[in-house]
């Protein structure tokens, strides 16, 4: 295999690697954005659950009805 063919092959491989790295980086950025959105949603759900538990706690503190 001549030196020119080897260099051409290496350049071709390098180009494919660069494309693959860019595609992986793009996907990583998208996943990071999704994770941030999910963390915000999870925080909102946790706050909402705490609010609801606080409301339920008030009801649970009441005495049971007379038929118990």
UniProtKB/Swiss-Prot annotation:
Give the matching Gene3D superfamilies. 1.20.5.300
One Pfam match, by short name? SlyX
Q: Would you say which domain of life the source belongs to?
A: Bacteria
The Swiss-Prot or TrEMBL record describes its family as follows:
Belongs to the SlyX family.
Identify the PANTHER family for this entry.
PROTEIN SLYX (PTHR36508:SF1)
**How is this protein named in the record?**
Protein SlyX homolog
Q: Which organism is it from?
A: Ectopseudomonas mendocina (strain ymp)
Please name the taxonomic classification of the source: Bacteria, Pseudomonadati, Pseudomonadota, Gammaproteobacteria, Pseudomonadales
Name the gene behind this protein.
Answer: slyX
């Amino acid at each position: 295999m001549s030196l020119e063919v080897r260099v051409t092959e290496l350049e071709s491989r390098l180009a494919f690697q660069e494309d693959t790295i860019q595609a992986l980086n793009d996907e990583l950025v998208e996943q990071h954005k999704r994770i941030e959105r999910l963390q915000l949603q999870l925080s909102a759900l946790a706050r909402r659950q705490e609010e609801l538990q606080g409301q339920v706690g008030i009801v649970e503190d009441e005495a049971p009805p007379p038929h118990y």
